[in-house]
């Protein structure tokens, strides 16, 4: 078995209590104040990263990468470009989600070739079928190649799924998190990509950020959501 494989062929269906997951998701809230003195254990953090790894992405292309910003000096510099990330930067772990740009998502790009041939190890005939359907998907079905922005937005959708699963795993462990969009993308890209060289801006853009750690205060009010009958329509 290659290092890219995760054995699941012979796994039996899980028999977990769904109430446990529902409880964790109810416990979760967008934490606005983190205890900077409390750190997530290595085992708990690795479980959160495994949730990211196991997340499904469109076509299985995994068009994302994670920057885990633990350097206090870099965190301090980031504050100048993010009006809504200040509290999150005090958390135990701070993640910048990167999404790939169009140059990496062309079917013959080195990245897609790596995914198809090395990670998935697809036979040539299956890869050829992918090529045909991908051309239809990108130009007609979802028009993800209509513009650079359309490609990046599609890629970023995958990063958001990853973030959601990481946050759910954190809640399951009794940890806290907060998804963060309160920053200037251009300025933050200039800082982290161009100035600090943490990623190649030709290939990646910043999709979203998230903080993970321990709450320093309890929620001030109960969670509110629409009722099921307000957003679920059953068509029979």
Language-model segments: residues:
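Acidic, surface-exposed loops and disordered segments
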Residues: 1-236
């Amino acid at each position: 078995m290659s290092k890219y494989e995760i054995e699941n062929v012979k796994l039996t269906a899980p028999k977990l209590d769904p109430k446990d997951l529902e409880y964790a998701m109810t416990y979760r809230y967008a934490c606005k104040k983190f205890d900077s003195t409390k750190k997530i254990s290595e085992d708990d953090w690795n479980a959160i990263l495994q949730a990211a790894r196991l997340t499904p992405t469109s076509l299985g292309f995994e068009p994302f990468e994670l920057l885990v910003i633990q350097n206090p000096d870099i965190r301090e510099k980031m504050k100048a470009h993010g009006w809504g990330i200040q509290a999150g930067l005090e958390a135990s772990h701070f993640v910048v989600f990167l999404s790939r740009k169009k140059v990496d998502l062309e079917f013959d790009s080195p990245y897609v070739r790596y995914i198809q041939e090395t990670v998935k190890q697809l036979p040539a005939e299956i890869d050829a079928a992918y090529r045909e359907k991908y051309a239809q998907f990108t130009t007609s079905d979802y028009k993800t190649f209509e513009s650079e922005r359309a490609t990046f937005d599609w890629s970023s959708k995958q990063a958001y799924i990853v973030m959601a699963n990481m946050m759910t795993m954190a809640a399951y462990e009794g940890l806290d998190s907060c998804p963060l969009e309160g920053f200037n993308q251009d300025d933050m890209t200039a800082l982290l990509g161009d100035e600090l060289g943490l990623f190649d801006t030709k290939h990646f853009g910043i999709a979203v950020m998230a903080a993970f750690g321990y709450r320093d205060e309890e929620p001030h009010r109960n969670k509110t959501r629409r009722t099921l009958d307000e957003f679920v329509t059953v068509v029979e």
